[in-house]
């Protein structure tokens, strides 16, 4: 039989899936990558290559592509199912390289940067009309609302209100055009504001240039604003009755273009969503009623028509319509008609009041006045709605940072372009200028300023186009338009002619071209031809004074609210024009965006037919060119993905350097540049990945930045783990301290139950059996469950589960039994002995597929045990006589035999304990077998020899030997508990507890067994030495066991040097043991003390591998791991296992395997006679107790060879101790070593800082 050894920390194959590496699974939903996800990865950079890559991805249903951190979005004109909650969740907490390109990735980056850098964020979405800008803005709002979710009611309400602004403002600000069914006809900049916890707490919407002309007229197949069709189709009966609401085809303003319905638009559903949005935002029912009352008034104003009277002037065709309009506006009907067909003119001379004239209007002029009234009401109504939404969004204070989302009309080129188009295209020019400033121009200028190595890249700067439109000196197009209006304000045609003449000033501008009644501006997106006719009139943007006075007469408070309160008739100041307003708004927008960190989304429209399958190469190629994607790719490939000032960078990442931080505090004493270098060095960032400028650090690739961010995130997790670990140590120390106090109190009151059980066991022997030295130790107590079978995670629990034992375990220990096969009856097999209140289990182990399994070999009912049989010598064999079972009796060997029979006796008082010169048991049912026992000095010191039914054992202590008293603990300044803050190793040398647990013994087995010579540790606690008068020979023997080299040259300690020798550091490695003949020593109770003369120094030890000689033949069981030996064979031994097996190798190195330790003895080479032994010294009981004390305080070098907890026999431990102490009395040496071995075995304490994996309890 061979001992099967397994790796101490080997993980079972089935547990490998519990690592942090997830098992690879096939993602059936992942689409095959088509093209490249980042245009910077293209092999060739050209407009055609970019176009082809976008086309491949579009045809594959992949609409998003990156240029670095810029997102390119191609409108799919269909639902791809990529905005679900599951997709949204997959982007949370991910950087853009971990997930495919998506608008959610841009939103995640914005929200992360807001929290990480505490800086305002914005996203600039640009592209032509119908490219998908509004949809992208909605998806960003969707993601931010989900990512910042919270259970707080007020925060949730703000998020709902922010999301509700989408359907509300889309209804009032979007319309169907030829290019887009949901085209934004106004600009909107939404700021979502966050509190200090980065939760949305407020919002702000800024409106830019509503296209109010659409209210009164649209080109063919376009529609008015969505709200008119929603209201006319979905209005309630109350509204229809009170406001006279009809179907959209009955109103001129909604039916003139010939398009009242669109296949992809559900007006009835959208109307319900609009009503719901009003309720979420907080509009009262009264406010909703007034809004729809004004919409009805606008529609009915459009139905007012005029005819020419006899004088050629205009008059109302049907006054019932004007009467109903006056009812809705709550003004006088006659005054309304008068304002529509007449114009009041007043003349004056200086301060004198002039005459007032009523000038009749013709049909065309009256129609223009009618439309002006409708446009004014709708424009002011829209502004009021935006202001009202802002009031609701600002209801919660505490905003500190914001994320801005810009959704504005795209670049427009129509067959006929007028004032609205030049305003829209001007704003897009400003946005393009921002993009150029921040991504192209300023980036290259910054590289030069920071002295970064850089090759300049050419690009088109559209600042010249912006100056052409907005400049005041020299005057631009808007300034020229204002001058024309001021010169001929009364006559629109004259003003248009004056404007046309002034346009000649721009004839030398390369981006301007004047044609008859038209002019061309060469925008970045292409050349646009504008009509001069009507521009000056649209630029006035002023309500006729008569209409303003009409509105002020209303009795409707809501209508009065949405219009200015008063009209300053005496003001000579020129009122602001529409051009002035749009320039001011655009500059304010640029200023707002410049205060935030921008993200960019460039949208592309694949075709003009809004088809989900068509991809117009020429149209997309044109957009690729004017968006400047090629230049952006070139700069991104050559530039740096991240740049930050030294101060900001250090503030963000100083935690990554231990030289710059301690416990979260900034500790760097040098300048910020030095801190930046130190951080990058400690983070192991290659120098090729960054450059240091004058004031900023530049990081080349986003992967490097993401790595820094990941390390910073992990820092907090590590800190939290350290705090948790320290807290758990503190709590455990309190628990351990409480247990120690409770144990001490219990022992003080009722005595130690384990020692009381031990004393009962001694009485059972009745002075009839010789004792082993370790059985008489003062620290010896009957602990019972030495394998900790009752714990949850232990080897004993594992054995218990495999054996199918469910009862509480009273006693458990390792042992040996004889091989039952004929011819091998002297071979010992390792077993596990488990005793429960009703049953004695003998558990054997088997090996299959390199795994050890445990099964019950014998199950004995305690009530069936008649007697137990032991010899009167110092062996460890026990025969258990069982009656009523047709099976052989158990015949076992265990070092804790006395404790076993003590527990059996307590569980069954009828069991008889037989002690004699022989052991009788039933080797076969009904057939008694007798085993004799004899004294033999050739037997192993700590074990015995079983052969031919005869046990050979050395002489033991007298049968009437008394138990040594338990040594008293010495007072010390050091803590009795383990050092939780020490980084020293926790081995046998550590001061331990009197009561072991499974964790303590198991740590000893896993961490130190098997080994032939344990290395002494330096972590033992320093105790005060005993008085000089109490240092006897046993103490000297113990010191010799731990320090053989020192002891061979040192004299017996005197009074002066006792303290010094006691606290001396242990040697780094024990010397090679020398075989010494054993000499019996008699014990005496006389308190005499003699000092032994020092022995002569031994010859120098040879530094060679220990050699052993086979004392008996060992045939083995045929296992490949065994090493068969014949008597006299000399081998080298590299390891000795406490279980009684040694790893040996033949001298020629041809074979290596395990042999029983009891079968080999140390091989003595001829090296001269050994030194004579020192004479024995008798010691009193007091001296013996103090020798125990010294044995426990000294380093536990002999613990590895004692191996009691690991299942080794006591005889083997005594033999190993004898070999480790040359020149000493055999009995005294064995006693000293036994003291140290048993004490440390019984006092091992578990260490909560152990590196062992406690969770791997099944891996044995």
Curated annotation (Swiss-Prot):
**Intrachain S-S bonds:** none
Indicate which residues the UniProt annotation says bind ATP: 127-134
Name a Pfam family for this protein. SH3_1
Tell me, which GO biological process terms does this entry list?
Answer: actin cortical patch localization; actin filament organization; endocytosis
Pinpoint the Myosin motor domain residues.
34-713
GO terms (molecular function) for this protein are: actin filament binding; ATP binding; hydrolase activity; microfilament motor activity
Domain named TH1 is located at: 769-959
What sequence ranges are listed for the domain SH3?
1103-1165
Name the residue ranges with Low complexity bias.
Answer: 989-1013, 1065-1082
What keywords are assigned to this protein?
Actin-binding, ATP-binding, Cytoplasm, Cytoskeleton, Hydrolase, Motor protein, Myosin, Nucleotide-binding, Phosphoprotein, Repeat, SH3 domain
PROSITE patterns referenced in this protein's UniProt entry, alphabetically: MYOSIN_MOTOR, SH3, TH1
Q: Where is the PTM Phosphoserine found along the chain?
A: 355
Pro residues: bias regions: 1092-1101
Question: Which residues fall in a compositionally biased region of kind Polar residues?
Answer: 948-963, 972-988, 1030-1064
**PTMs?**
Phosphorylation of the TEDS site (Ser-355) is required for the polarization of the actin cytoskeleton. Phosphorylation probably activates the myosin-I ATPase activity.
Gene Ontology cellular component list: actin cortical patch; cell tip; myosin complex; plasma membrane
Q: Where is this region: Disordered?
A: 948-1106
Annotated InterPro entries? Kinesin_motor_dom_sf, Myosin_head_motor_dom-like, Myosin_TH1, MYSc_Myo1, P-loop_NTPase, SH3-like_dom_sf, SH3_domain
Domain IQ per the UniProt entry, residue ranges: 717-737, 738-763
- Give compartment(s): Cytoplasm, Cytoskeleton, Actin patch
Q: Which domain of life is it from?
A: Eukaryota
Annotated family: Belongs to the TRAFAC class myosin-kinesin ATPase superfamily. Myosin family.
Q: What task does this protein carry out? A: Type-I myosin implicated in the organization of the actin cytoskeleton. Required for proper actin cytoskeleton polarization. At the cell cortex, assembles in patch-like structures together with proteins from the actin-polymerizing machinery and promotes actin assembly. Functions as actin nucleation-promoting factor (NPF) for the Arp2/3 complex.
Q: What is known of its domains?
A: The myosin motor domain displays actin-stimulated ATPase activity and generates a mechanochemical force.
Protein's name according to its UniProt entry: Myosin-1
């Amino acid at each position: 039989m061979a001992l099967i050894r397994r790796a101490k920390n080997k993980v079972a194959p089935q547990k490998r899936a519990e690592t942090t590496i997830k098992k690879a699974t096939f993602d059936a939903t992942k689409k095959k990558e088509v093209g490249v996800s980042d245009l910077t990865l293209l092999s060739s950079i050209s407009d055609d290559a970019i176009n082809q890559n976008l086309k491949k991805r579009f045809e594959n249903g992949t609409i998003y592509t990156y240029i670095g951190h810029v997102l390119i979005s191609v409108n799919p004109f269909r639902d791809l199912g990529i905005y679900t909650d599951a997709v949204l969740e997959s982007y949370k907490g991910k950087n853009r390289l971990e997930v495919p390109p998506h608008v959610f990735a841009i939103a995640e980056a914005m929200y992360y940067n807001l929290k990480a850098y505490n800086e305002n964020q914005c996203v600039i979405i640009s592209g032509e009309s119908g490219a998908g800008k509004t949809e992208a803005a909605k998806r960003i709002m969707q993601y931010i609302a989900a990512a910042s979710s919270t259970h707080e009611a007020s925060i949730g309400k703000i998020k709902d209100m922010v999301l509700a602004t989408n359907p509300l403002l889309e209804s009032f600000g979007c319309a169907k055009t030829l290019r887009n069914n949901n085209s934004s006809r106004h600009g909107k900049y939404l700021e979502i504001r966050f509190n200090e916890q980065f939760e949305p707490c407020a919002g702000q919407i800024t409106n830019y240039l509503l296209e109010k002309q659409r209210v009164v007229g649209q080109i063919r197949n376009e529609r008015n604003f969505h709200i008119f069709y929603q209201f006319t189709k979905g209005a309630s009966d109350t509204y229809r009755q009170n406001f006279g609401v009809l179907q959209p085809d009955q109103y001129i303003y909604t039916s003139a273009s010939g398009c009242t319905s669109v296949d992809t638009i559900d007006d009835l559903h959208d109307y319900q969503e609009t009503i719901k949005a009003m309720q979420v935002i907080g509009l009262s029912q009264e406010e909703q009623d007034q809004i729809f009352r004004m919409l009805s008034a606008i529609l009915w104003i459009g139905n007012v028509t005029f005819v020419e009277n006899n004088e050629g002037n205009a008059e109302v065709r049907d006054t019932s319509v004007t009467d109903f309009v006056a009812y809705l506006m709550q003004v006088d009907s006659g005054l309304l008609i008068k304002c529509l067909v007449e114009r009041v003119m007043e003349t004056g001379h200086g301060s004198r009041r002039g005459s007032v004239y009523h000038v009749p209007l013709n049909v065309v002029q009256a129609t223009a006045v009618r439309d002006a009234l409708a446009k004014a009401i709708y424009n002011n109504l829209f502004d009021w709605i935006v202001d009202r939404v802002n009031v609701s969004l600002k209801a919660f204070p505490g905003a500190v940072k914001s994320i801005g989302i810009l959704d504005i009309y795209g670049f427009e080129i129509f067959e006929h372009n007028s004032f609205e188009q030049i305003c829209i295209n001007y704003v897009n020019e400003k946005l393009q200028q921002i993009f150029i400033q921040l991504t192209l121009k300023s980036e290259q200028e910054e590289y030069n300023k920071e002295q970064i190595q850089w090759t300049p890249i050419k690009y088109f700067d559209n600042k010249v186009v912006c100056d052409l439109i907005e400049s005041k000196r020299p005057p631009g197009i808007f300034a020229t338009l204002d001058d024309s209006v001021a010169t001929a304000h009364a006559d629109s045609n004259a003003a248009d002619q004056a404007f046309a003449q002034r346009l000649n000033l721009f004839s030398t501008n390369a981006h301007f071209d004047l044609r008859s009644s038209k002019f061309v501006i060469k925008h970045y997106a292409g050349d646009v031809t504008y009509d001069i006719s009507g521009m000056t009139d649209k630029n006035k943007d002023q309500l006729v004074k008569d209409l303003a006075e009409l509105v002020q007469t209303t009795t409707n408070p809501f209508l009065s609210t949405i219009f200015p309160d008063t009209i300053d008739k005496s003001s000579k100041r020129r009122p602001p024009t529409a051009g002035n307003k749009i320039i001011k708004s655009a500059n304010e927008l640029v200023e707002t965006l410049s205060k935030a960190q921008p993200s960019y989304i460039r949208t592309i429209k694949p075709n003009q037919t809004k088809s989900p399958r068509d991809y117009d190469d020429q149209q997309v190629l044109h957009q690729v060119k004017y968006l400047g994607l090629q230049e952006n790719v070139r700069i991104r490939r050559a530039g740096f993905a991240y740049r930050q000032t030294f101060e900001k960078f250090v503030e963000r990442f100083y935690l990554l350097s231990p030289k710059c931080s301690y416990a979260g505090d900034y500790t760097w004493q040098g300048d910020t540049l030095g801190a930046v270098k130190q951080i990058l060095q400690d983070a192991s960032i290659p120098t090729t990945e960054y450059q240091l400028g004058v004031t900023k650090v530049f990081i080349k690739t986003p992967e490097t930045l993401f790595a820094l961010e990941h390390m910073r995130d992990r820092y907090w997790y590590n800190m939290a783990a350290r705090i948790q670990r320290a807290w758990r140590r503190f709590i455990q120390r309190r628990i351990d301290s409480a247990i120690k106090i409770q144990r001490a109190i219990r022992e003080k009151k009722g005595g130690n139950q384990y020692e009381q059980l031990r004393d009962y066991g001694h009485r059972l022997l009745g002075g009839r059996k010789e004792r082993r030295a370790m059985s008489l130790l003062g620290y010896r107590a009957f602990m019972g469950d030495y394998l900790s079978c009752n714990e949850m995670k232990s080897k004993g629990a594992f054995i218990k589960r495999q054996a199918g034992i469910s009862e509480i375990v009273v006693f458990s220990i390792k042992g040996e039994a004889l091989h039952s096969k004929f011819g091998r009856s002297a071979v010992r097999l390792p077993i596990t002995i488990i005793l429960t209140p009703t049953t004695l289990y003998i558990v054997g182990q088997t090996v299959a597929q390199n795994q050890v399994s445990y099964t019950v070999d014998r199950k004995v009912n305690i009530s069936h045990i008649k007697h137990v049989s032991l010899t009167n010598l110092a062996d460890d064999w026990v025969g258990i006589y069982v009656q009523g079972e047709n099976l052989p009796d158990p015949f076992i060997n265990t070092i804790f035999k006395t404790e076993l029979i003590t527990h059996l006796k307590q569980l069954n008082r009828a069991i008889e304990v037989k002690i004699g010169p022989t052991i009788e048991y039933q080797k076969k049912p009904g057939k008694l077998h007798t085993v004799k026992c004899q004294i033999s000095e050739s037997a192993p010191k700590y074990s015995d020899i079983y052969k031919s039914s005869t046990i050979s054992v050395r002489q033991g202590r007298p049968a009437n030997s008394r138990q040594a008293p338990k040594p008293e603990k010495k007072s010390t300044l050091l803590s009795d508990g383990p050092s939780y803050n020490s980084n020293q190793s926790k081995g046998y040398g550590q001061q331990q507890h009197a009561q072991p647990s499974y964790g303590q013994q198991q740590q000893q087995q896993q961490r130190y067994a098997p080994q032939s010579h344990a290395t002494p540790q330096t972590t033992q606690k320093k105790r005060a030495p005993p008085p000089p008068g109490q240092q006897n020979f046993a103490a000297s023997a113990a010191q010799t066991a731990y320090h053989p080299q020192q002891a061979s040259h040192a004299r017996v300690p005197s009074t002066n040097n006792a303290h010094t020798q006691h606290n001396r550091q242990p040697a780094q490695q024990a010397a090679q043991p020398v075989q010494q003949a054993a000499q019996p020593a008699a014990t005496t109770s006389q308190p005499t003390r003699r000092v032994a003369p020092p022995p002569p120094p031994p010859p120098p030890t040879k530094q060679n591998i220990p050699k052993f000689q086979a004392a008996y033949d060992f045939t083995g069981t045929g296992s490949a791991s065994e090493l068969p030996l014949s008597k006299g064979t000399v081998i080298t031994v590299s390891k000795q296992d406490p279980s009684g097996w040694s790893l040996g190798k033949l001298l020629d190195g041809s074979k290596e395997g395990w042999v029983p330790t009891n079968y080999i003895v140390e091989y003595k080479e001829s090296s001269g006679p050994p030194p004579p032994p020192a004479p024995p010294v008798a010691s009193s009981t007091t001296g013996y107790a103090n020798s125990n004390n010294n044995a426990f305080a000294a380093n536990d070098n002999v613990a590895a060879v004692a191996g009691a907890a690991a299942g080794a026999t006591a005889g083997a431990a005594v033999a190993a101790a004898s070999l480790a102490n040359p020149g000493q009395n055999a009995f005294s040496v064995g006693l000293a070593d036994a003291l140290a071995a048993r004490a440390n075995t019984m006092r091992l304490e578990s260490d909560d800082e152990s590196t062992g994996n406690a969770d791997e309890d099944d891996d044995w």
